Amino acid sequence: MENVRAHLYIKGKVQGVFFRQSMKEIAVRYGVRGWVRNRSDGRTVEAVLEGPRDAVAKVIEWAKVGPPGARVEEVEVDWEEYKGEFQDFRILPTV
């Protein structure tokens, strides 16, 4: 299975609804590594996902809906070169 890397920007009502924790749980379930964090604009969550293409695709599909309480308006996905730099999936501080 081919490994891929995706850089996501998820916009809408995605902060204050447990989006990051929920994404971490979904990513771990599918064996995806990387990170997720809030952006300081108050309406964007950013994430980098690495893993098998089908697993990353499942996390991206989940991100289009998010957890209960979220209202996702847009998910921008930038495909990047796979680096294999992550050992796990983490929640990073807001930037």
Curated annotation (Swiss-Prot):
GO molecular function: acylphosphatase activity
Top-level lineage group: Archaea
Secretion signal span: none
Span of domain Acylphosphatase-like: 5-93
Catalytic activity: an acyl phosphate + H2O = a carboxylate + phosphate + H(+)
InterPro entries recorded: Acylphosphatase, Acylphosphatase-like_dom, Acylphosphatase-like_dom_sf, Acylphosphatase_CS
Keyword entries, A-Z: Hydrolase
List of catalytic residues: 20, 38
Enzyme class per UniProt: hydrolase
EC number: 3.6.1.7
Family: Belongs to the acylphosphatase family.
Name assigned to this protein: Acylphosphatase
Gene: acyP
